[in-house]
């Protein structure tokens, strides 16, 4: 209580748990400033401690940050939308002091329960269930429009949810009529409509649900170049990443380490024009005979590029980015920023792990403390 600014001891709670949420949001507004202060203040010291193969080198890559949501299915999304609409209709009927309109919710619940209990669902049964749910949702939306016209109202949360349900209904109706499973801007969660599916093509999971970030490493410090909930091609951001490096350092990097997705013709021409060496072979057919020395250079560059992959693994492991459990856009962004700052702090502790001496004097008593920070592995930081 003393360190948070209270003058006297009290048995009352100084704050509740929601206060920490607002505190983290305030931290999110200055995380980029903190990274800039660290890099500007300690750049010369960091560069003096880094190996030569990491100086004037820019490493860039992209990854997705999974969000904890229920795996989206068309039938479950429509059933949840139907339940939300029934609650809205009941509230609006109470406002107008009229009898709630008939929604056939008992029949809809019985059909949904019978369908959800089946361990294996055939395509015809799923399509039939989607058709029924679409009919229930369309009827409820029509009732809501009528009650709104008669003077009923919805609160802010219900108004936002109604807009999401209308968009979900249009998407599901389009996919049902066209017999497809693809639609632009597909909604996968009613509570978090900003989340979009990100096709990653990984062996473990082909599709991930969460924001995609384009990150870079310069002088050992990780920074975010782009943050978006929609899928994007990170190769188109290489020019912006190079400009960001120039704005921070005042010169262009000598070498860029990136995977094959970045080695497009436009990016290679850009790097050649700026005098930057882009690691890795060119895209297209491999030559019949390749110089052994060049092959070794490409192999070494790929090993050095693995540093950013190890950074992603550290952030998704001990720092918890493998599954983010926060709900709002701001809290998700703050969680990612905090993880990146902690990863940078770990790197700084590894570089500046010299002995520290603290001298404390209190009431004519002197205490001398000697300690040293040791960083071992990726999980134990003491």
Model segments located where?
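Flexible loop/turn segments at secondary-structure boundaries
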Residues: 196-198, 222-224, 231-233, 262-267, ...
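A short, flexible helix-boundary coil/loop motif
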Residues: 295, 318, 322-325, 348-382
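Phosphate-backbone recognition surface of nucleic-acid-processing proteins
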Residues: 2-22, 278-280, 286-293
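Active-site- or DNA-interface-adjacent structural scaffold in DNA-acting proteins
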Residues: 6-192
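Short, conserved catalytic/metal-binding motifs centered on acidic residues
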Residues: 16-20, 56-66, 215, 238, ...
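Helix-centered, glycine/charged polyanion-binding patches within enzymatic domains
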Residues: 260-330, 334
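Electropositive, glycine- and tryptophan-enriched low-complexity nucleic-acid-binding patches
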Residues: 2-4, 194, 202-248
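Short helix-capping/linker segments at secondary-structure and domain boundaries
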Residues: 71, 221, 343-356
């Amino acid at each position: 209580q003393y360190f948070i600014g209270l003058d006297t001891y009290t048995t009352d709670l100084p704050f509740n748990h929601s206060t920490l949420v607002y505190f983290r949001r305030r931290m999110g507004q200055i995380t980029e400033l903190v990274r800039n202060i660290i890099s500007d203040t300690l750049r010369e010291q960091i560069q003096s401690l880094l190996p030569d193969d990491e100086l004037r080198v820019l490493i860039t890559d992209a990854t997705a940050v999974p969000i904890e949501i229920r795996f989206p299915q068309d039938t479950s999304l429509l059933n949840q939308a139907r339940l939300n609409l029934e609650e809205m209709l009941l509230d609006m009927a109470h406002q107008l002091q009229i009898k709630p309109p008939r929604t056939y919710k008992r029949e809809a619940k019985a059909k949904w329960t019978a369908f959800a209990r089946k361990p294996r669902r055939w395509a015809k049964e799923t399509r039939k269930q989607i058709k029924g749910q679409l009919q229930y949702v369309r009827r409820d939306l029509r009732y809501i429009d009528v009650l709104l016209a008669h003077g009923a109202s919805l609160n802010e949360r219900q108004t936002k949810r109604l807009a999401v349900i209308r968009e979900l209904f249009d998407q599901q109706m389009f996919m049902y009529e066209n017999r497809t499973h693809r639609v632009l801007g597909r909604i996968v969660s009613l509570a978090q409509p900003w989340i979009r599916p990100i096709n990653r093509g990984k062996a473990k999971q082909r599709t991930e649900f969460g924001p995609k970030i384009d990150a870079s490493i310069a002088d050992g410090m990780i920074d975010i170049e782009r943050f978006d909930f929609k899928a994007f091609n990170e190769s188109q951001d290489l020019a912006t990443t190079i400009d960001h490096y120039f704005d921070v350092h005042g010169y262009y990097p000598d070498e860029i380490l990136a995977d094959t997705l970045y080695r497009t013709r436009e990016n290679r021409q850009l790097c050649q024009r700026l005098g930057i060496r882009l690691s890795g072979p060119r895209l297209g057919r491999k030559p019949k005979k390749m110089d052994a020395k060049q092959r070794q250079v490409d192999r070494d560059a790929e090993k050095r590029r693995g540093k950013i992959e190890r950074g992603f693994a550290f952030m998704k492991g001990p720092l918890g980015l493998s599954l983010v459990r926060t709900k709002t856009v701001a809290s998700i962004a703050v969680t990612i920023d905090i993880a990146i700052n902690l990863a940078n702090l770990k790197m700084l502790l590894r570089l500046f792990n010299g002995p520290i001496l603290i001298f404390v004097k209190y009431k004519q008593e002197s205490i001398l403390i000697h300690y040293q920070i040791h960083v071992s592995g990726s999980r134990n930081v003491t």
